[in-house]
Amino acid sequence: MLNIVYDASVVANIFYKNDNRSGIFFAGWNILKKMAQRPDVNLILYFRSDCCADGIFLKEKFLPNTPCIQNMSNYMFLCKVYRKIHCWYDSVYCHLYLRKVFGLALKMLSCVFSNIVKVDKKRLQTADAFFSPVYKIPDFIRMYPHIKTYLYLYDAIPFVFPRLNPYGKKFIVEIMQSTKQTDFFFFDSCCSENDFKTFFPSKIGYNTAVVPLAADETFKSDRNAQNLNSVREKYHIPANKKYVFSLSTFEPRKNLIRALKCFVTFVEKNGINDIVWVAAGAAWVSFYKELKKERALLSNGLIFCVGYVDDEDLPALYGNAEWFVYTSQYEGFGLPPLEAMQCGCPVITSNNSSLPEVVDDAGIMIDWESDEQHIEAYEKYYFNEELRKENAQKGLERARKFSWDKTVEEIIKKMEKC
């Protein structure tokens, strides 16, 4: 029986539907759920001070039988106050002054939690391992040398493209500066492992393993007409049009503007009038403004930017799309194409970084910066129904090679050997 302290901070915001619910959030959540279900694991939850309040409610609702290493239940009133302010903060996010006021209140309460919430030292004395799916290993864990420490690292993209995400670079530096020679690192792809070894050769040694991510079990083909009609109506997608689907953050690295421009060219070149593009995902404000500058993309009724999509609506959107596009400039893994394949949707992705590890030969792979290859790929799928069916089937078979059960099984095996 392994006694694992799990840093569940990244999933504490499960109650808030915002752009924090990214691939890393879902990775942390699915690994947590699968570990909690295993009979050979005794799981203990840990939350950072700024996640304590939300964490106690997550535990009570989803993991009532899983103990927590902190005594947060003693401060339920403060937890409720924190959650209320957090809801207000989200609701006024677009208003700079109010956002600052509520943000300051949240920081003050986090400081209070860091001073009053105590760690159960008895549980630490019997713990075998500490697993962090995102954040650095807490300093207090280092005081217990018998606890083996494990981190899951996703990508070094802020170092590959430092100008695009300076905050991400700072975040990774903070993690890597805090690591010790005894830490064990899991990576979601060989590409990510190689990148970290390139940028942090003195930190990453032989204590590593590649353990791929997976799509949630809820992602499966949903061709129920009633469900699709409901989703179309909810996101204002024309009922009389076929659609291409994309899901990503609206950031430059995702190469979305190029993909959209090529789609418009493809439609105009071939005189097509029965298909549109549905672009979903959490928006980076500055990039969304850039997208709006491309008036030709938004003025002809071909592009529908639906923004954040509820989790329960994604299977229908994936499963009923003509094809899915994810021609990113660079990825650490690439979870959306895997979700699309698991829903029986043919995919088009770029042929770089980690994406070949995910898609293999189950989709069309192209150069991310080639307009010609984008247009050719769209034409192949639009004019060849058999190819769409063939790649949809290949995608389903490819997706079966990934599962959260396999991911967690590999993690536990490594922990048992170390």
Give a label for each model feature.
Residues 1-418:
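Carbohydrate transferase catalytic cores enriched for Leloir-type hexosyltransferases
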